[in-house]
Amino acid sequence: NEELTLEEKAEICSELELQQKYADIASNIIGDLSSLPMVGKIVGTIAAAAMTVAHVGSGRLDIEQTLLGCSDLPFDQIKEILETRFNEVDRKLESHSAALEEITKLVDKSISAVEKTRKQMNKRFDEVMKSIQDAKVSPIVSKINNFAKYFDAEKERVRGLKLNDYILKLEEPNGILLHFKDVRTPKDDSLQSPLFSIIQERYAIPKTVDDELAFKVLYAILYGTQTYVSVMFFLLEQYSFLANHYYEKGDLEKYDEYFNNLNNVFLDFKSSLVGSGASNNEGLIDNVLQVLMTVKSNEFLGLGKNSLEEMLNEKINLFSKIKEEIEGKQRMTLSETPENFARISFEKDITTPIGDWRDSREVRYAVQYASETLFSKIGHWSDPVSVRAKACPTLRMPVDQTRRNVLVFRKFDNSKPQLVGEITPYQSNFIDIDRDLYNAASNPDSAVGFMEFKKLISNGANIRAVFNQGRTVFHAAAKSGNDKIMIELTFFSKYTDINQPDKKGYTPIHVAADSGNAGIVNLLIRSGISVNSKTYNFLQTPLHLAAQRGFVATFQRLMESPEININERDKDGFTPLHYAVRGGERILEAFINQAGIDVNVKSDKGLTPFHLAVIKNDWPVASTLLRSKKIDINAIDENNMTALHYAAILGFLETTKQLINLKEINANAVSSPGLLSALHYAILYKHDDVALFLLKSSKVNYNLKAFGDITPLHLAVMQGRKQVLSEMFNIGININQKTAEKYTPLHLAAMSKYPELVEILLDQGSNLEAKTITGATPLNLATFKGKSQAALILLKDEVNWREPDENGQMPIHGAAMNGLLDVAQAILYLDATVLDIEDKNLDTPLNLAAQNSHIDMVKYFIDLGAKVNTRNKKGQAPLLAFSKKGNLDMVKYLFDKNANVYIADNDGLNFFYYAVRNGHLNIVKYAMSEKDKFEWSTTDNNRSDGCSGECAISHFAVCDAVQYDKIEIVKYFVGTLGHYSICSPLHQAARYGHIHIVKYLVEEEVLSVDGSKPDTPLCYASENGHLAVVQYLIRNGAKVNHDCANGMTAIDKAITKNQLQVVQILAENGVDFRRKNRLDATPFLTAVASNSYEIAEYLIREKRQNININEQNGNKETALHLAVYYKNLQMIKLLVKYGIDENIRNGYDKTALDIARDNKISSIVEYLQTKSGKFRREYKSSNGEHDLLHENRISNFTDSKNLEYQHQHFINADNDASQSFSNTAANQNIDVIGTLLLIDVLIRRFSKQGYINNKPDSASDGIAQAAALAITEKFEDILNSLHNKSTEEQVDFAEVHRKIYAALRSGRNSQVHQVLCSSLKSISTLKPEDIKKLVSVVLSFQSSISLPEVSASAREVYGETLHLFHES
């Protein structure tokens, strides 16, 4: 078997979500161990160890991942990743000019935010690409994918280059920078074109919860947009780097060129991404945000797409932040290029030669504006001035009117320019002297440097002037080692001067220690410098730097300071002793001889100096540490890794031998949480020589079990280490060892990429029939992991091919699932009876082969006589599988093999529906042509969705074609076959918002825009908020006031679903605001009753002339009454704000405040009493018949405690009498209490009572008589509907009427409930089916109410009440 390439292995392992984990650890390892005293190999080693821990996960080494070779990644891929990262870090360590620092910060911050989420999407996007088959969409998405892959590949390739190659690559004519700049152009291979095509065609807007194509395209547009943004930041990063590079080289012309490119790239991309304010054009991010908001607003998101909603919110936040970041940055640079107004005169008496000043040389000056974080380009160079006898001229220039600082640059002849100083806003004279002082201190010729220093100081040079990376003359002298200058500086300076840090936190003593200038270090210590000060990024002290460089003399001078802390830690917890490991034996010897040194000191990751010496494979250094009697050779890091573990991981054979020979060594120490020993690691990382040595050592336990009971033998099989296995067999190891999951070595070999190991283990007597914890034999695993060779080897050895695992699956099922035809043939040759054998999911081999599209396998099984109509537990069958995937040839083949064409899955979907839903027109046409086998007019009893009676396949097929937005199939059904009325396609297209289908049906098939059903297409589109469809229908003559079903209009539908934009469109197109619906409510009242605050506000504010804010419904209720009923304080405030009359009384003589008081809604009462201004009035309670007739709202019914109490009290009063009734009902799952409550609601509606007031109000005789009679008659009608004669015999309705009348007349209203419940309890023959019928009859009476003094609107309210109860 050939080894997988790194790319192939990475792809396989990424499917196990390991690749990203490794890459993330590799990316972070630089940051985590950035101050490590050695990088290169040591960081790679620690990264590998860290990844092994990640690989082990919660403690168990994942067998499948190891078998795939994923454990190699820490040493294969990590090396590539780290090399790339180190090259990148090396480049970034170059100093940035001040002008580029802020840009670099912005770019780094933004790249990390965008790239993090883009990398997370990368793997998923490949899956999306493979699954998109749509002819229109696939080419567009492919462009996004192709560009993204090219961008990633080029970006990573460039970043891995060394500095010179990196520069050459970036500056290639017509190279990657130019190509990436074209991403925002409409070129065919750009990103702009496909992204806007998707947006404009609305391909990323899902029509239904099952619109998988749209969800995939949505994923694509998000990935593409993030790539677009990444391209911008990548370009900014590269142009910033190039500008900085040439700034450091002194090529200011090149610097200006790239500085200008940097700004232009930003402005161009800013315009494309967030639009141009001048033209009001929306940018890409705005369009994408609109798409996200549209998708988020779809109601079906709650139906199983919660993770999608979470993703949408995440992306909305991300793109909003990116937009804010880009919009907030007006420019990357100052737009103005400074003019050079400098007048140069030599006024100082400083004679040449000094520093760079030599007679006959020519000097030029250029300036740059600096304003907060923005910088301009560097201006043109001044005319040259010849140097004649004098140096350090004075520059005079006008004060900048905008109060910007001016940076001054100097260049001699064609040499590298230097920054020589900064002119403050109110300064007009500048003496060019301070840079020469800095240069004098930097001069390696200390005598010349000192002489120049003295002359410049005497002429007023400033020792505090700041230059490169914030360094002063103190830093320069510390680096050059000029002790005379340093003596002068320390004599005249303040304490703060000698402790002044540069931009990275290096003080002069840091620089001296890093340069090995022991004398300067000694001088600075005596001057009182802080000897333990730390750098900013890595928190290194001067002692860290001296130790790393191996400067023994400097170390000794530092140690003479009484304040020195020899164990001071850096950012990652490394002490100077750790750094000394890199410095060598001499410096290490000097360290361990110091009093107070901790030779076993650990870093934050738990690494000791001895760990580092072994990882560095530097045994002389390790031996030096061993000379300390206190050294702990078995010290462990945070993962319980000893030095021996690292030697085994790295494959250092000689170091491993040295360690094993140490008397105190613990050869069997195990890591945590994986419990892996050095032997485990040597095998895991394929270091055979180390593993063989450890196997032969008497100190090593070769049967040691890691977490999950994985032994070295198991690992040797997983990694295919034949030589190691041979040695294990020689020493008599048990070859049937089992892991915690009962894997034997033979199981692992059967799953591995080393089939030859199966034969080797069989020759050693491995158990063929051993089972894992899931009941799988080696043969089971070989077939289910697709290992054909291993399976065939096992089959030759008289293995049991009928052995099922815990899922009832046999080797034949695994062979079928993975298309192992040769294995299936071998099994069926041995035993033909397994051809149709089912697993626990009722899957046969044929069904599994079909589900996985193994065509040859399917045909082979059918040719042998397999049952072609096999169905599993979900109803999946071969014909359904191939139809779903669009394989016409296999559909034809199965037709010819007499497959049942009407076979359906558990959702009632047959092959025809699958073809329709997935847009496979070829299969649809073929099916329609096979009339002798398939007839779409056949009644389908498997489905009932959207069909009130018996419907044919044709009905569901047309409905599906429209719902799933398959326009070509719709055209075929409607246009070609002429089925205009089946499933009302125009209505369905409007319901689901498929505008192109709507247009086709109206324009090409000339269907009426108002349809022929009670509900019009406009009704459906309005209710579901499909703006484009609503606008189109109206433009094409749809009647906006046409009746919808249930006596509503389109605007009513839109209002009840809170579709504000639809309401606005309808309002502008002639909707009748005075028209009342079946609830006797206008659109305005409907908005209030629907709690649609935004719509109510819009109607009041924008359509005031069309509405009457004080209008009343049939019960004389105003919007304020309704808002109180629904306890909507926000709505109440809105109505009061716009002047609604609070004094209006409803049909029961109640104001809104009365109702709030009756229902004890304290917040509303308080507001209406105290905060409603001029409309407030004193409330006077009136007693009498109005209380009895007051009709309460549904919310009050559900809130009532009185009814529940009365009902429960009554039921519990006679448990014995009701026992049989209750038991029977309970056994039949009948909601008796709910039924009684429903009847109670019915009766209270008839009596116009609502829930009974607690105070005993008596009613007038006439009203009480009428109400009692109405209640009794309706109660009798309901019971008579049961056609139960004993019911009529057992209930005395005259007595019922008498008791109800007495209760109402005396004001004891709550007794009505008891009277009716008592009557029901007296019916001993009432059965559960009677209760069910009772409920249905109660509901049916909503359409046949005839009671005294009950208005039509009251009946409608009553009907709505019953409807809501029924729904609940």
UniProtKB/Swiss-Prot annotation:
Cystine residue pairs: 392-1044
GO BP terms: exocytosis
Q: Where expressed (tissues)?
A: Expressed in venom gland, cephalothorax, and abdomen tissues from both males and females.
Q: Give start and end residues of every ANK repeat.
A: 469-500, 504-533, 538-568, 572-601, 605-635, 639-669, 674-704, 708-737, 741-770, 774-803, 807-837, 841-870, 874-903, 907-936, 953-981, 982-1011, 1013-1042, 1046-1075, 1079-1109, 1115-1144
What GO molecular function annotations does the UniProt record carry, in alphabetical order?
Answer: toxin activity
Q: Keywords on this record?
A: ANK repeat, Cleavage on pair of basic residues, Disulfide bond, Exocytosis, G-protein coupled receptor impairing toxin, Membrane, Neurotoxin, Presynaptic neurotoxin, Repeat, Secreted, Target cell membrane, Target membrane, Toxin, Transmembrane
Query: Region entry Furin-like endopeptidase recognition region: which residue ranges?
Result: 1174-1177
Superkingdom field: Eukaryota
Claim: Hydrolase is one of the keywords in the record = no
Output the InterPro entries linked to this UniProt entry: Ankyrin_rpt, Ankyrin_rpt-contain_sf
Subcellular location as annotated: Secreted; Target cell membrane
**What residues make up the propeptide removed on maturation?**
1178-1368
Q: Where is this region: Helix H8 is the probable transmembrane region of the tetrameric pore inserted in the target cell membrane?
A: 217-236
Domains: entry comment: The H8 helix is predicted to insert into membranes and form pores by assembling into tetramers. The helix is contained within a helical bundle domain that undergoes significant conformational changes during pore formation to allow exposure of the H8 transmembrane helix and transition of the toxin from a soluble monomer to a transmembrane tetramer.
What task does this protein carry out?
A: Presynaptic neurotoxin that causes massive release of neurotransmitters from vertebrate (but not invertebrate) nerve terminals and endocrine cells via a complex mechanism involving activation of receptor(s) and toxin insertion into the plasma membrane with subsequent pore formation. Binds to neurexin-1-alpha (NRXN1) in a calcium dependent manner, adhesion G protein-coupled receptor L1 (ADGRL1, also termed latrophilin-1 and calcium-independent receptor of latrotoxin (CIRL)), and receptor-type tyrosine-protein phosphatase S (PTPRS), also termed PTP sigma.
In the record, the note on similarity to other proteins reads: Belongs to the cationic peptide 01 (latrotoxin) family. 03 (alpha-latrotoxin) subfamily.
Query: PANTHER family from the entry?
Result: ANKYRIN REPEAT AND PROTEIN KINASE DOMAIN-CONTAINING PROTEIN, ANKYRIN REPEAT-CONTAINING PROTEIN-RELATED
Protein name per the record = Alpha-latrotoxin-Lg1a
